[in-house]
Amino acid sequence: MDIIAAIEDRSSAARLTEPAPNKEQLEKILRAAAHAPDHGRLSPWRFAVMEGPSRGILADAMADLLLRNHAHASAEMLVAEKSKALRAPMIIAVAAHVTAGHKVPEIEQVVAVGAAIQNMLLAAESLGFGSMWKTGAPAYDAGVRQALGFAADDQIIGFVYLGRQLAPGKPREHTLTGLVRYL
């Protein structure tokens, strides 16, 4: 596989369907994550894999969050919020488990988790799956974090949605104009 082409061709897939990665494919995706650069070898990533009915845990937690923030949310709003957790056959919540006070600064530990997620996206692509890295209010909510079984001081960095892409994504053109300074 040409890694540059894979990086340039990969795009987020908004519409994903069955099948989800099987056990062997999931293992490859998670192993790719664990191969991310990790100063201090702290393995600061934690994963919560949701497939099939277990996505309902996330759906319920998202609905609870909506109700806490909008006590008068309509039934339609709750259904719409829950449906966000059903947009892919598999969702992996990825959290940073930071070792506070370690010689490796916290920011480096969190960035390592971001690199792990990028590895997951590229591994999924190489296995023929579409993917999307999502965040939003649920990623920053203690109730969602608790519902997914993460430690109180873990921070969800993203939700990786995985499945078969219904329509080809549109890779973006990226320019370096104004972003690079040569010294």
Kindly label every feature range from the protein language model:
Residues V144-Q155:
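Short, electropositive alpha-helical surface patch
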Residues V79-G101:
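Ordered, amphipathic secondary-structure segments that act as subunit-interaction surfaces
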Residues I3-A6, S12, I156-L183:
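C-terminal helix-cap and adjacent tail motif
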Residues P89-I91, G130, Q155-I157:
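Structural motif
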Residues G52-S54, H97-V98, R164-A167:
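Short loop segments at secondary-structure junctions
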Residues A33, I92, V98, H102-Q146:
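Small-aliphatic-rich amphipathic alpha-helix that forms the alpha element of a beta-alpha
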Residues M1-R87, L183:
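N-terminal amphipathic, basic helical "cap/leader" segment at the start of enzyme domains
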